[in-house]
A protein has these predicted regions:
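Ribonuclease/tRNase effector modules and their secretory precursors
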Residues: 1-94
Length: 94
């Protein structure tokens, strides 16, 4: 995971932690989950390509991390992160 770079809006990160109980720092770990499931998310932005990652945090919580890629794919911008719901847990490859 050391080659991955992350960025986010600090205000959004604070709001996300309050609302969902998931820090963006914790969400970074989902990107190192070898079983992570990457899903295209074309419906939520016309300006940029967005993606949803289902992946495990270091504390083994299954997270849903909405993100996009910046700087020609060299930077991952985290937009939101939350715990997966029952339907999302059912599609996660274990």
């Amino acid at each position: 995971m050391s080659s991955l770079r992350f960025e986010w809006d600090p205000k959004k990160a604070t709001l996300n932690l309050r609302k969902h109980g998931v820090s963006f720092e914790d969400a970074q770990a989902a990107f190192s989950d070898e079983n992570g499931l990457l899903i295209d998310d074309p419906d939520h932005s016309e300006e940029e390509d967005r993606f949803v990652l289902l992946g495990l945090s270091h504390s083994l919580r299954l997270l849903v991390v909405v993100h996009c890629y910046r700087s020609e794919g060299k930077v991952i911008r985290i937009i939101s992160a939350r715990k997966a719901d029952a339907q999302e847990r059912s599609i996660y490859p274990r």
